[in-house]
Amino acid sequence: MRQHTLEQAYAYCETVCRNASTTFYSSFSALQPDKRRAVHAVYALCRWVDDIVDGDEEPTILETLELRQATDERQRIVDDIHAGTSPSLTPDEHRRRMMALVDIRLKLHQASEQSISQSDHPIFIALQDVFQRYPIKLNDFETVIEGMEDDLYPVANQTWDELRSYCYKVASAVGLILIE
């Protein structure tokens, strides 16, 4: 496995941000360098999970027994939330994307606990540093991932409260992360 320094990890996140959204990238340039790097890391994670859910990213997953069990457990929770609704994808594709989100969730926990290694994905290396420097809540990242899980199902918000809940997950939670 490739080893990444913290500087390389932040450079990777900056590249993701610059390539994905020149508007966001330009607006972030007004921030102080340390805050800008942290925002690039958060943006890179959000872009990555969105690309996975949309099928624009093929995640490399080391499928372990722990990951399979965690995915099964998370799928039961998501099935309860979306009771009566089938995923938008084939069962195999849905499982693959759900497993990728669970893997990311587990890695976020490791980053918040400062247990990421230099061989982990550069986004997690950068986020580990962000968790150390800023009072960011892991729960807000989990809320963003819950919004991505919702995107694996047909979005059919029928009430204002349903729309508000969805928007909170995919937008407001990101804002809560960034204001820290």
Protein language model annotation of sequence segments:
Residues 1-180:
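Acidic catalytic motifs of isoprenoid enzymes
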